[in-house]
Amino acid sequence: KTSFFDVSVSFHELINFSIKWNNTLKNHLWQVRFILPEPVHTTFSEDMNTIIERKFNPFYDIRKNLPKKRGIEAKTNFAPMQRYVGAQGVGIITKGLTEYEVFENTLSVTLLRSVGVISNPKNPARSTPAGPPLEVPDAQQLGENIAEFSVGFFDKDDYEKFVTLVFPKIVL
């Protein structure tokens, strides 16, 4: 069976995307991947209203590095962001999407991470859970979902200009 997304696109200085879909899958990760020309070693993202530079090993594969001893958490190529992440001159501004991943020459933004248990004791990336397992069935985000983001070609030093295009400043 084939599934499709409807993607609305508009172009100004940024290309704006709005993706609407009906999520019927539990415990699933939805991402949009941006394939860049080179392996992604460095990203710049907005965190706490400033730009953070992060270094990555683009060839790191968590599945090949799962911890064998208790109390160890596997390194990951996922990172948080507020509204912006960029690499190699590509900038992505999101509305409420706060996680991205680096792997090889791709920069992926998480559209939806549907989960049913927080601190799942069966998570292979953690040999010891972060806390007691908590069931959160609504975190599966079943049903209609909308993800919005904008993409442009700009340097990290210009990110505020482009963030303002998506989130105009309000003067009181």
Task: Locate predicted features.
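C-terminal (or distal) subdomains of carbohydrate-active enzymes
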Residues: 1-172
